From Swiss-Prot:
Upper lineage: Eukaryota, Fungi, Dikarya, Ascomycota, Saccharomycotina
Record-level GO cellular component terms: endoplasmic reticulum; membrane
Signal peptide: none
Residue ranges of the TM segments: 29-49, 76-96, 98-118
Organism, as annotated: Saccharomyces cerevisiae (strain ATCC 204508 / S288c)
Presence of keyword rRNA processing: no
Protein name, entry field: Uncharacterized membrane protein YAL064W-B
Topology of this chain in the membrane: Multi-pass membrane protein
């Protein structure tokens, strides 16, 4: 699906290459740019998945968790993070059918998935 974010989130300081337009905090992110982020507080993960009945549900957890992504959407929970370097990058693997594993180390809200119009960015502000 065009516009899917495909970068992986890990609970450590990390530098990644942006491979698609993604949600971010107060920063312009373009494809091909390098983004440095760091997780420094307790972690809350929001995952949007489909139930057997086809209803979309938002799953919250404070423990390590693995889910299969069945719907690609932007998380509706507010983002709370502390910017340590260039930008706080809070995107996880969001290709449909992919397994996503979350290692919870500290609280931070993670935007799990986002679908954007080509060359456009969705911004989420605190």
């Amino acid at each position: 699906m065009a516009g899917e974010a495909v970068s992986e989130h890990t609970p450590d300081s990390q530098e990644v290459t942006v491979t698609s337009v993604v949600c971010c905090l107060d920063s312009v992110v373009e494809i091909g740019h390098h983004v440095v982020y760091s997780v420094v507080t307790p972690l809350i993960v929001a995952v949007l998945i489909d139930t057997m009945a086809g209803e979309a549900v938002l799953e919250h957890t404070s423990d390590s968790q693995e889910e299969i992504v069945t719907t690609v959407v932007c998380s509706v929970v507010p983002l709370v993070c502390f910017v340590v370097s260039v930008v706080c990058f809070v995107i996880s693997v969001v290709e449909i059918g992919h397994h996503v594993v979350y290692s919870v180390v500290a609280p931070l809200t993670v935007t799990v998935a986002v679908e954007t119009i080509a060359e456009e960015m969705d911004s989420v502000h605190t």
